[in-house]
A protein has these predicted regions:
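Catalytic-core segments of hydrolase enzymes
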Residues: 1-91, 163-165
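Carbohydrate-binding/catalytic loop surfaces
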Residues: 176-178
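Hydrolase catalytic cores
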Residues: 86-174
Length: 178
């Protein structure tokens, strides 16, 4: 059926309110808002100031991944902080049987006697976050280990990432998707 939700102030306050539907598995695919807003979908902990919030995009056609949360936050913070490749990304498979002798179970060995590592393809913002985690590791190595910025902080890491990001010249930044 069609539900109507009434929201009342318990104190004399004005402002906006936001509603989210539960995740998959708790509602049917037919359950929708009549006038949905695809923005302000970033949730905890990514909607707070400190974390580096990562969106995902398709690196083959430079489109934002449809399930990537969009900003800004309810409190007006500009999020996501950065977008990284997150669609059909190939990488090593976890828990797929690398034997104790260093060979892939049932897979033989790779070139020059190295173990063939089972590969898999994944999609999502977790994949994009892994890209950014690698970039952060490189920044920490450059800044702290190599001595270029020994007082590097979360804020400076975020600033380096944002300043170094490739931007589409047809778009204005910041924006709610990228």
């Amino acid at each position: 059926g069609i539900w109507k939700i009434r929201v009342f102030n318990t104190q004399y306050l004005t402002g906006l309110f936001h509603l989210w539907l539960p995740s998959q598995g708790l509602i049917s695919d037919e359950t929708v808002f009549l006038t949905p807003n695809p923005y302000t979908t970033i949730t905890m902990p990514g909607n707070t100031a400190s974390p580096i919030t990562v969106g995902a995009y398709n690196h083959l056609n430079n489109s934002i991944y449809i399930h990537s949360s969009r900003g800004y936050t309810v409190g007006g913070l500009i999020k996501p902080d950065i977008a990284a490749p997150g669609v059909n990304i190939s990488g090593p498979a976890v828990g797929r049987g690398i034997g104790s002798a260093g060979t892939a179970a049932g897979r033989g060995t790779g070139s020059a006697g190295t173990a063939a590592v089972p590969m898999t393809t994944r999609t999502g913002t977790s994949v994009a976050a892994a890209h950014v985690a690698g970039a952060v590791a490189n920044l920490l190595s450059w800044g702290i280990v190599e001595g270029h910025n020994i007082t590097m902080s979360e804020a400076s890491i975020k600033a380096y990432l944002i300043r170094g990001a490739r931007r589409n010249p047809a778009l204005s930044y910041p924006n709610r998707e990228w």
